[in-house]
Amino acid sequence: GMATNIPPHNVGELCDALIHMADVRKKDPKKAKQTGGRPEILDATLLKYIPGPDFPTGGILAESKEAIAEAYRTGRGSFRVRARYEVEKLDRGQFDIIVTEMPYQVQKAKLIERIAELMEARKLPFLADIRDESTEDVRLVLEPKSRTVDPDMLMEQLFRQTDLEIRF
């Protein structure tokens, strides 16, 4: 057999797209009959209803609309999913980076362990500490070594070396 890994989608968006397809079929039954009962609907129209996968753990879909459309059109491709983060300002110019959403199917404990290993191996020179302050919501606190570190540069480094960015 053939293996597949289809990302999760929003059920409401899928239902809206199906209703639209049914409406198109009702409006022109003769044309629908000529196409074997399947109405011809442009990909761009369907993308208005289904803009992309909807991951239950959140995260940011880091793909262009064109890449998503191509993956849907061909049935091939993958999506880059990144953790969502925000920069929390502290006093005296200090800041922490707070990860609030994880990529789909990434285990938080393994991610923390991997970041700790990289810190021990001195492969993350700009990161001083990582703390898991999660309760019901995800809250990973990344503490930079100094306030001169660019938070976006630090996150890019983490995206490259850890599962804070994955391909699905």
Model-derived features with residue positions:
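Intrinsically disordered, low-complexity regulatory segments
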Residues: M2-F168
